[in-house]
UniProtKB/Swiss-Prot annotation:
Pfam families: Ribosomal_S19. It comes from Tetraselmis subcordiformis. It is found in: Mitochondrion. This is Small ribosomal subunit protein uS19m. GO terms for molecular function: RNA binding; structural constituent of ribosome. GO terms for cellular component: mitochondrial small ribosomal subunit. InterPro entries: Ribosomal_uS19, Ribosomal_uS19_bac-type, Ribosomal_uS19_CS, Ribosomal_uS19_SF. Keywords: Mitochondrion, Ribonucleoprotein, Ribosomal protein. Belongs to the universal ribosomal protein uS19 family. The keyword Mitochondrion applies. The keyword Mitochondrion applies. Gene3D superfamilies: 30s Ribosomal Protein S19, Chain A. It comes from the Eukaryota.
């Protein structure tokens, strides 16, 4: 189920407290926040629970959540069977 339209997109209050300096701190803990147009072209670091993942925000990412771009689980690698 998607979010109700009347509520609008969720953006963590942390982004509103910043003083407009885009280069001072680009680390984002809030994976649940929606990517807004003001982030286009900026490189941000998203925390996946283990390390910081650096991602450059592009126009296609608007409307998605930050957490979609920093995976929290390790990809499985299947070993080849030897005969």
């Amino acid at each position: 189920m998607s979010r109700a339209i009347w509520k609008g997109p969720f953006i963590d209050p942390f982004f509103f407290r910043k003083n407009g300096s885009s280069n001072s701190n680009n680390k984002i803990y809030s994976r649940r926040s929606v990517v807004s147009p003001k982030f286009i072209g900026r490189e941000v670091e998203i925390y996946n629970g283990h390390k910081w993942i650096t991602i450059k925000i592009k126009e296609d990412m608007i409307g998605h959540k930050f957490g979609e771009f920093a995976f929290t689980r390790k990809a499985t690698i299947h070993k080849k069977k030897t005969k």
